[in-house]
Amino acid sequence: CLAIAHVSLQVGDRELAALVLCLAGATAGFLVWNYPYGMIFAGDGGAYLWGVVTSVASILLVQRHPEVSAWFPFLILIYPVWETLFSIYRKMARGVSPGTADALHFHQLIYRRIVRGVFHEDHTHQMRIRNSRTSPYLWVFALLSIVPAVLFWRDTPVLVGFCLLFMVSYVGAYIAIVRFKVPKWLRL
């Protein structure tokens, strides 16, 4: 949201910036109240609301301001988009329906292969706190696409390059975690 607000202000669209800043404020309030103890469950409804508002704001930004590359919002949203596409591919490659639930999503692997190894059961005895320790890893990973998107919001070839780099990095990190070859610096 902040990335879209920043670019909206860069192109002079104060109304759109205000809309996404409201969503960012609501998200920050939810985060302050909810992290790390999980006091409120946003669930699918919350995720859909955030996704729809972010997507509509992205479409409006690109539609109203042709100087903003259409790849800007794509790079901002590449993590959930690529996670979904990769999960569909992964399941189809195994001959499983893409609609079948599994525990092989990136965040679940980070939890099972990294977080549980770093924060032992005796240090975090509450399930909600253990689960919340996955979030900082995902925030850093998401920033790998958000920062370049904000820096190069007009430059389509650079944004496409960062999209490809993100996809390759995601697959590389996924394979490394699955094979238990997680770099030591990620375990800190």
Task: Describe these PLM feature segments.
Residues C1-L188:
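Alpha-helical transmembrane segments
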